[in-house]
């Protein structure tokens, strides 16, 4: 995955991808690739055990998200951009590929609810907090989120046992397979757009990264140890997606709302680079504590 990051960096630095081009790729990920990842994860045979595990993963995922939001508020309540950036991980762009790499594509089933909830909260509460305008906290805004829609569609497919024909599953799987390389290429472009010297010499960014990459994952592991042994794989999935770096959407929202997008990009980039060290450590710790 690190190689894809380098490719994105080089493509931008050599002018083969522009800033507008990277925005288009990010939209492709959000509106097409990630929804296909979610829908594909629900194209499996229904079972009562699977239904219970899905409910557990959504409930536990909601708890983990609330934990992250509470921790970020505690540390950064006077800095809305830092608070929202730290609260919401890059669960879609980095979490999904990591879950697939570590546990297999089937495990994305357990991450889908978390990622959809995260995006819904980021889309509504996140933008409201950043802008100071509560107009973003509306049901209509939630229902326009592509990941929420794909989760709802996936739940209907799964519980109603709707067969998805092969001619749809094949292209859906192919598009879903683009997630890891495309997401990391986009992150590489973000990195290339940033002044690396400014990133590494700004102490505030290290504080943000420490909370996002160390404090929150450690608390997540402690809380998920309460899950029964039979549900530890669900715990592993949630640890992976909640140990991911600061979500890149914070940069998109900052730019859209006319805020300091360079600050947002810097926090995304430094936390992404540092996560190459912290993620293996957190996964190793989780494995040592009995997670799958």
Question: What does each model-identified segment do?
Answer:
Residues 1-292:
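Alpha-helical transmembrane segments of multi-pass small-molecule/ion transporters
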């Amino acid at each position: 995955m690190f190689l894809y990051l380098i490719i994105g960096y080089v493509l931008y630095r050599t002018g083969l991808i522009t800033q507008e081009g990277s925005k288009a790729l990010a939209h492709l990920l959000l509106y097409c690739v990630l929804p296909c990842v979610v829908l594909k994860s629900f194209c499996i045979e229904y079972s009562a055990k699977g239904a219970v595990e899905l409910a557990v993963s959504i409930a536990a995922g909601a708890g983990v998200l609330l934990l992250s939001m509470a921790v970020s508020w505690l540390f950064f309540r006077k800095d809305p951009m830092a608070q929202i950036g730290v609260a919401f991980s890059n669960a879609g762009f980095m979490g999904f590929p990591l879950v697939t790499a570590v546990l297999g594509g089937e495990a994305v089933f357990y991450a889908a609810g978390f990622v959809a909830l995260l995006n819904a909260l980021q889309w509504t509460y996140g933008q409201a907090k950043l802008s100071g305008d509560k107009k973003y906290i509306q049901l209509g805004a939630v229902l326009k989120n592509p990941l929420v829609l794909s989760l709802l569609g996936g739940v209907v497919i799964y519980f109603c046992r709707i067969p998805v024909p092969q001619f749809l599953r094949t292209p859906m799987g192919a598009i879903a397979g683009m997630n890891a390389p495309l997401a990391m290429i986009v992150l590489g472009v973000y990195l290339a757009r940033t002044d690396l010297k400014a990133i590494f010499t700004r102490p505030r960014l290290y504080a943000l990264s420490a909370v996002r990459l160390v404090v929150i994952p450690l608390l997540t592991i402690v809380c998920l140890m309460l899950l029964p042994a039979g549900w530890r794989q669900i715990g592993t999935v949630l640890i992976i997606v909640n140990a991911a770096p600061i979500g890149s959407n914070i940069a998109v929202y900052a730019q859209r709302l006319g805020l300091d997008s360079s600050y947002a990009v810097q926090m995304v980039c430094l936390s992404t680079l540092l996560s190459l060290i912290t993620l293996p450590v957190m996964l190793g710790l989780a494995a040592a504590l009995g997670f799958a």
